[in-house]
Structure formats: structure tokens, C-alpha cells
Amino acid sequence: NYGFQNYFNQHTYLRELAEGLFPDNVYERVKRLQEEPRYSFEHMDKRKRSLQQYAEDFRTVYNKAWAKFTGVKPIERAHALALMNSLRPIIDQRLMYFAYYDGKPIGFYLMIPDLNGVIAPLKGHFGAWDKLRFLWRLKVSRKATRIFALIFGVIPEFQGKGIESGMIYNFEQQVNTPHLKRYKSLELAWIGDFNPLMMRMVETLVCAKKHKMHTTYRYLFDREKPFTRAPKMTVKKD
């Protein structure tokens, strides 16, 4: 192996989109959330809220759920809006989920169509005509059949209450509607083994299974220096 050693593994998880895949305890937890009117789950709908408001809801949750981890920085309002604007051409509103408690954002689960099947026929070309073909295949003929999960998060005080399951459950209720029935599976990629909390959440709350694994190797030119694997993600101390 020429001295290269396993620095970290990144897992890709896959989940088929069909009702009845959650274990009973998850359904019971989701049912309790549904019976509490202070909780609400909704997909992006720009008739209800502006893109700017969704960007701010995303920023609010991200900075509470993710920015406390080592190596993760909080994001500013302008950055969050720029991220949403960059996704605008490929957004399917019914794949962008938010959770609220008393109308305040407590979680998000952001997904987009997997573009691999949409882009492949373009054969690497992306001129003006190819862009039109791309949009036609994505928005009109709807060639994407797999969903790619970008990121999800729940603010700390609501973690462990099934909010993640509540969002994906509400999404799955729409899978068989005419707009979404073309989607058959959900992929969650690049989840490192240095983040065991995320792996556990994906396996127990999203109920996805490991599908692929990519390994990053490291070589130390200083052969006297002890090798250590990537440090685990931990919460920053105040």
C-alpha cells in the first residue's frame, strides 16, 4: 500500500421510497408529533413564504444545529440567500422540507433531484441549447428518478424527538402523488465515519442502509510521526 493509511471512510446511504419502511417505534413517535398542534412540517412553497424567508429559516437552524461542531463555521444571512439562489434552477419545492414549532424553524431536510440521469445525454456539453435540453429533462419530462439529500439538521433542544423522521414521513406521504411518484429512492452521500452521530441518525431515524463507501487515505512524509485517523466531530465547548 506504499505507506498510505485509512484516514476516514465516507458512506453513501440508500433508502427506497415507499410507505411502511419505518419501524413501529418511529411511526409512534411521528404520530405523537402530529397530535401536537405546535409542531408543523411543510415543504417549500413560495406562495406561503419567500425564498428569502426560507433562506433565513435555513440559516437559523444551521447555525444552531451545525455551527457548534468543530470545524464548522456559522453562516451569514447573505451567504444563506446566495446558497438558495444557486439552487433555484434545480429546486423541486416538494423536496425541500422544514419543521416548525410555534411557527419558528427547528429543522430542515433539503433534497434535490439526482442530476446524473438528466445530465448524461448531454455528454459533457453545456452550451445554450444543452441548457434548454437540461431544463426540459429536469422540469418537463422529469427524467430524475432518484433524490439526493443535501443536508438535514435539527436544533439541539429538539433533537431526539423524531423531528427528522417527521420530515421524511411527511415527504413520503407525497411520494405517490402525480408530481412525485417518479422518484423511487433517496441517496444520502459523503457521511464520514468521523461523524458517528450523523451515521446513527441516518440509520435509526431515516432508516437508510449503507450502499457505497469511499475511503480517503493519508501518507505521512515524516515516517517517525505517529499516524492517527481523522478526529471525530465533537461539539464546541462554550
For each feature predicted by the language model, list its residue ranges.
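A conserved beta-strand-loop-helix scaffold within acyl/acetyltransferase catalytic domains
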Residues: 40-154
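Acyltransferase donor/substrate-recognition loop-hinge adjacent to the catalytic core
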Residues: 2-70
